[in-house]
Amino acid sequence: MSVDLVVVGAGVVGAASAYFATLAGLRVVVVERGAIAGGTSSAGEGNVLVSDKEAGPELDLALYSQRIWREDLAEHGDLWEFESKGGLVVAASEQGVASLRALAVHQRRAGVEVRDVTRSELPDYEPHLAPQLAGGAFYPQDAQVQPMLVAAHLLRLARAGGAQVRTRTEVTGFLRAGDRVTGVRTSAGDITAGAVLNAAGTWAGGIADLAGVHVPVLPRRGFILVTQPLPARTIRHKVYAAEYVGDVASSDAALQTSPVVEGTAGGTVLIGASRERVGFDRSISVTAIGTLAAKAIALFPMLREVRAIRTYLGFRPYCPDHLPVIGPDPRAPGLWHACGHEGAGIGLSAGTGKLISQALVGQPTDLDLTPFAPDRFPPAEEAPR
């Protein structure tokens, strides 16, 4: 079988890439060793955020991706429950408020909409917030989707345009003509292709290894608590503590927790967020879960009387410099990457897929991909450990 593009991975990034590549006229096959959205995409909160990003390439990509969600994909938003709910970042001290204000200055210059929120205004946004909080910032562009629905429907739309999706099909190696990648070997046979896109999420480093190139994507474990359903709009926005921004940008391998609380269309409340680098350890951390619950109650005291009905975990695809890997790999011509988005992959998926499709067909990309270059990392033997 021969196609224009093989996409490795059927999570949200792979699905978005397949969708936009199909729209661009490419013949596409998606191969996935498990099920659609069976990895990190099944364990995310569905964040489409600008609020948690400092000015720089990732924020530029987030703003671009917002445009793709709201324009290119607007007609399909109901399929994946796109909700432009806005994000409220809160601080417990005046010093924390000052830090939020300083961050907002640079975000506004980049194009982010931010409203300063005083202590007295916080109840107007969230009536159940703890009264001792010092202030915050509101980000009307923040939104939420259901990531498993995103992946499923984007792939359905891609199939309607002629793409093929092969689940339970594992990539075991690459086909080559000299140094050039010309396809993949899979558990179901070989597929030749003009290009192969590594969109394998947390497992993208392993796919890169098969091609003989180093892309340092590492798993960063996180837990989410889910509560019993509450009345509609009990919690109106995505609400998180100011220290969450620092945790997102941190490279620390140790456990970090900062409260993130938001409601869903079904009434349940999602509580995060923890980060730790423990490999692919799927054991439940009572410490992490207990800390998340305590910090969520500190933000919303009414949650003390609410039952948690389940918890789940996932692995964010972490890169050491906190930027995703997007674009062609000059070390292995024919190999492309769209991975390493860490906790921002849901929100950044739409923009990533559109940019990849533009580059694949030789169009100028709407955003400069240089900061996301796959070969920006030192060789594996030189990388810090």
Please give the residue ranges for each predicted region.
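Beta1/beta-strand and adjacent pyrophosphate-binding region of the FAD-binding site
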Residues: 1-13, 29
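Dinucleotide-binding Rossmann-like beta1-alpha1 core, especially the glycine-rich loop
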Residues: 45-125, 258, 296
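Glycine-rich FAD pyrophosphate-binding loop
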Residues: 22-42
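Helical element adjacent to the flavin cofactor pocket in flavoenzyme catalytic cores
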Residues: 137-194
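Active-site substrate-recognition segment that forms the wall
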Residues: 19-23, 46-48, 80-83, 180, ...
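Short beta-strand to alpha-helix junction loop
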Residues: 60, 89-99, 138-156, 283-288, ...
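Short hydrophobic core segments
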Residues: 6-8, 191-203, 207, 353
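C-terminal catalytic lobe of FAD-dependent flavoproteins
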Residues: 147, 281-385
